[in-house]
Amino acid sequence: NRDWAWQTQTESDSRIKLYNQWLPHIHVDFHEQGINSPYYFAPAAEPFHEYITDWQRELQTMIGKNHAKYFDKNNWLYFTKEVFDLLYPSYGDTYPTYNGAIGMTYEQAGHSRGGLAIETEDGDTLTLLDRITHHYTTGLSTVEVASQNVNRIVDEFVKFFSEGKNNPKGEYNTYIISKSNHIDKLNDLQSWLD
């Protein structure tokens, strides 16, 4: 989960190769957290990195409001904006975001202690069915909002790459790598960039 950008693990390397072949417009990283935490979904915590576009923020908020509608209807606890940010570039939400997608993490209580059912510290019972239902609901809610905004999602995705190519925000437009470097290091870099 923390190795998307650095790809030090074989699994991460394989994941990124597949991700880059597909380049999804929306990417959700479904997770579980400690058993006593309510469900978490976007929008992410402030501050946002300066390269995250207004559109990425806007769609995260739209999706989060849609999730809230379903959670409120069912009296399910949730939170947003408090903990999980979009600063570290190597998470399953930030890597897609920094690559033009709407990247989000959804955190459900349960984790390895959850089992089929577990009593939380406030005396409630958290079941596997609850956990599945919450993730299922946010998954379909994400698809619902995406279907209502499909043209804008595609347009903004294209715009992200067009602006990156024609009007990059960073200080540098080009990097020069000396040919005098060790050939294995150059091959590793080329492989990583591919």
What is each stretch, according to the model?
Residues N1-D194:
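Structured catalytic-domain cores with a bias toward divalent-metal coordination
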